[in-house]
Amino acid sequence: MFCVQCEQTIRTPVGNGCSYAQGMCGKTAETSDLQDLLVAVLQGLSAWALKARELDIIDHDVDNFAPRAFFSTLTNVNFDSQRIIGYAQEAITLRESLAVRCRLHDATATVDHPMAALQLAGNDIPTLLQQAADFALDSDKAIVGDDVHGLRMLNLYGLKGAAAYMEHAHVLGQYDDAIYAEYHAFMAWLGTQPSDVDTLLNNAMGIGKMNFNVMAILDRGETDAYGNPQPTAVNVRPIAGKAILISGHDLKDLRMLLEQTEGTGVNIYTHGEMLPAHGYPELKKFKHLAGNYGSGWQNQQTEFAKFPGAIVMTSNCIIDPNVGNYGDRIWTRSIVGWPGVNHLEGDDFSPVIEQAQSLAGFPYSEIEHMITVGFGRETLLSAADTVIDLVAQKKLRHVFLVGGCDGSREERSYFTDFTLNVPQDCLIMTLACGKYRFNKLDFGTLEGLPRLLDVGQCNDAYSAIILAVKLAEKLGCGVNDLPLSLVLSWFEQKAIVILLTLLSLGVKNIYTGPTAPGFLTDNLLAILNEKFGMRAITTVEQDMNTILAA
C-alpha cells in the first residue's frame, strides 16, 4: 500500500504516505492496492476513448462510467474491495467494446499506450493484489525523484477531484464533450508515467482550467433543476418525529428522497455538504426538510450513533460505521461503499423510509438555533454594487473567503480563531464543510449585510470566482487587486482541484492549511510560492496583519 492523497496521511522524517495494513482514513491496504489497479485500467480506457474520438466515435457509456469509477478512489468514498474489482472489470468490458467499434471503423486502429491492453490477472483478490503491486503509485519514485513523483500526484489527485465534479454534473444531466475529451487526454497521459517537470506543472494548471468548466456545468445543472439559491434560515436542532439523515453532495438524491417521504411523517435532515440544499427554492419548499444535523464529517461516528433514524450517504465522506454501531442504519448510494453496509440501487428509497419509520426518531423538539445559508451566485452578484459602495465609503475594508475541507487535526482550530479575529468592518464568505468550524457563531451584520455569507458546497467556489471577476470588472482592476483574500483548508482531492482551478485563473497569495499536501516537496512548495504567492498559514495574528497591511 502507498497512499498520500489526503491531509491526514502519515508523515515521518523518512517520507510521507500511508504504507501499512491500513491507512489513516480506514482504507485497508487491500482496497488501496486494488484502487491503484483500477486507476491503471481506467487510464487504458481513456487511451481508447481518445483513439475513438480521432475516428469520430463518442461512446457515452464510456464517458459516463470513467469519471464515476475514478471518483470511487477518492478519500472516504468506497472502501469495498469487491466493488472496486467490479469497476475494473466493467472498465475492461467497455474498453474492449470500444476497441471493436474502432476497428470496425478502421481495421488498423490501435493504441500505443502502456495500459491500453491491460487485463486483470484473475478474479480473486490474492491474484489481483499480486498484479496490483506493479501499479503502486510509488513504484518508480526512487528513479524519477520526489519532485516528479509529487507533481504526478498533484495531477492525479487534481484529476480525481475534477472527475468527482464531472459525476455530480452528469447526475444532473450535464454533459460537455470538450470536457470529457480533455479528461480522457489527461487520464491517458498520466498512464504514460510522465516525468518532465514543466509539462507536469503546465498540465496541472490545465486540469484546473478544465475543472472551472466542470464547475460551470455543475452550477448550471443545480440551478436549472432547483432554482438559484436564496438566503434561508436553517434550524440546526432536531424536532420531534421520525427521521432520515442524508449526507454527501447529491442534490438529486435529496430531491427524490423528499418526494418519496412527503406525507409519511418522516422528517429529512441534511448533513455535511448537503447543508446548502436548504437555499434552493425547489428543495426548501418541502415542509419536512426539517433542518441540518451534526457538524464536520470527521465527527460522524459520534453524531451518527446518536441519530435515531436511517442515514443515507450519497457521496464522500463515509468513515467506519461499525465504530459507532450504526452500520445497520446506514445506506450507501452510487459510488459510495463500505463492506457489509446496505447499498441502495435504483431510485426507490422505500427500504430507507421503512427503516426510518421503524426506528424511534427524535422524542422531542429542541430549542431552535437558526443559521443562514443560500448566498449563491445570483445573490452575490446582486450585492456587488452594494459591496463596491461600501468599499468606496471605507465602510468595508476587506473580504475574506475562509473555507474548504474540515478534518480532525487540532491545528484546524486556526480557521475558527481566524474568523473570530476578522475585524468588524470586514466580511467573511465561506463554502464547503470547513464552515462547520464557525458557521454556528454569530458574526452580526455590516451595513445590513450579514458578515458571514455561506456560498454553498465546495464546487460553489465557482460562484465566488464569478463574484470576484465581476467586482474586478466594475472596479477596473484585476482580481488580485481586490480587497479579497483566500484562506483555504484542504483535506482531499476536490480541494486540490479547486486550488488548481484558482491558480490556473491567476489567483495569487492564497493561504492554505492546516498542513501542506504530503506529496508536495519543499522544492515544489517553493515553486508554487514563487509563481503564485501560495503560502502556508502561520498564526492568526501574523497572517491577519500581513493580509490587512498589503
Swiss-Prot record:
UniProt enzyme class: oxidoreductase
Cofactor field: [2Fe-2S] cluster; hybrid [4Fe-2O-2S] cluster
Catalyzed reactions: A + NH4(+) + H2O = hydroxylamine + AH2 + H(+)
Pfam annotation, one family: Prismane
Residues annotated to bind [2Fe-2S] cluster: C3, C6, C18, C25
Gene3D superfamilies per record: 1.20.1270.20, 3.40.50.2030
Transmembrane region(s): none
InterPro entries for the chain: HCP/CODH, Hydroxylam_reduct, Prismane-like_a/b-sand, Prismane-like_sf, Prismane_a-bundle
Cofactor: binding comment: Binds 1 [2Fe-2S] cluster.
UniProt superkingdom: Bacteria
EC number: 1.7.99.1
GO terms for MF: 2 iron, 2 sulfur cluster binding; hydroxylamine reductase activity; metal ion binding; peroxidase activity
Binding site for hybrid [4Fe-2O-2S] cluster: H249, E273, C317, C405, C433, C458, E492, K494
Keyword Flavoprotein: no
Localization: Cytoplasm
Cellular component GO terms held in the UniProt record: cytoplasm
SUPFAM superfamilies the UniProt entry points to: Prismane protein-like
One biological process term in Gene Ontology: response to hydrogen peroxide
Residues modified as Cysteine persulfide: C405
Main location per the UniProt record: cytoplasm
Protein name: Hydroxylamine reductase
Species of origin: Pectobacterium carotovorum subsp. carotovorum (strain PC1)
